Amino acid sequence: MITVSNVSLTFGGQKLFSGADLKFMPGNCYGVIGANGAGKSTFLRILSGELEPTTGTVTIPAGQRLSTLKQDQFKYDAYPVLDTVIMGNQRLYDIMKEKDELYAKPDFSDADGERAAELEGEFAEMDGWNAESDAATLLTGLGLPVEMHTMLMGDLKGGEKFKVLLAQALFGNPDILLLDEPTNNLDNRSVAWLEDFLMNFPGTLIVVSHDRWFLNNICTHIVDIDFNQVKLYVGNYDFWYESSKMMQSLMNDQKKRREDKIKELQAFIQRFSSNKSKAKQATSRRKLLDQLTIEQMPASSRRYPWVCFTPEREAGKDRKSVV
């Protein structure tokens, strides 16, 4: 679970969003959408604790493990692929390495034996014996062939590294999973496998993606970053699209009615303010006019493609005929 309270962010003098109050619950998948530059990836960095918000707080219950899709494809170049995936649960990986170092000591002492026993107990509780097979299953599902599982990360291509880092994020049943564009570099089969995995994920899942089909298949909620606000909608991408259009239409209608009312009052005041018999009514309407305000709607950060072809001349009315 993640609780976001009054979070705002100003970046480079520009306000990306403000007053965000959200609660992300286990068992739900939240798709984060918005225009390029709206702050989707930045919002994920705030949730993960990598970036401090300008105002507000992000709260995660103690003991919950958070996993993110790493973006640095060169960080693990010196490590084998399987080890890189297992690093998704850093505590488990540290236990495995410390065990190996202890058992490799030529002067293995009683103290070393006691420490090894402690590590073995924790290792078993974390299902460590299945770590390599679990990592291999993730890699295979994402389309990385078995022969690459023992290679060094530095020997892989960019798309192959991405699959390893995605497997790393998925590894070890985290309580909270944050994924930024997870379908990049995946073919259709791997995307289908990932959808199935995420639909069965029991924790709190938050995904940034431009793939509306992917979001439709996995999301229970949509988080829309637009108009310098972060709003939560129940439902998948299509439901958000219809709901947001309806909400925008209602806001436009409300603004139009208020504008029409102001024009009506202004016309009455202008017409009858000098008429003694209508003076009280004009004064009453002036007070009402002073109470009416038109809230300026912030501009949307979305830009939709638009193409217009202007003809050089008007089209003829008669079709060409041959006699």
Where do the language-model regions lie?
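Short, flexible cytosolic linker that couples an ABC transmembrane/permease module to its adjacent nucleotide-binding
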Residues: P298-E314
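Intracellular alpha-helical coupling/juxtamembrane segments of multi-pass membrane proteins
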Residues: S243-F268, F272-Q296
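ABC ATP-binding cassette signature C-motif
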Residues: M1-K255, F309-V323
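Short hinge/gating elements
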Residues: G121, Q270-F272, P305-V307
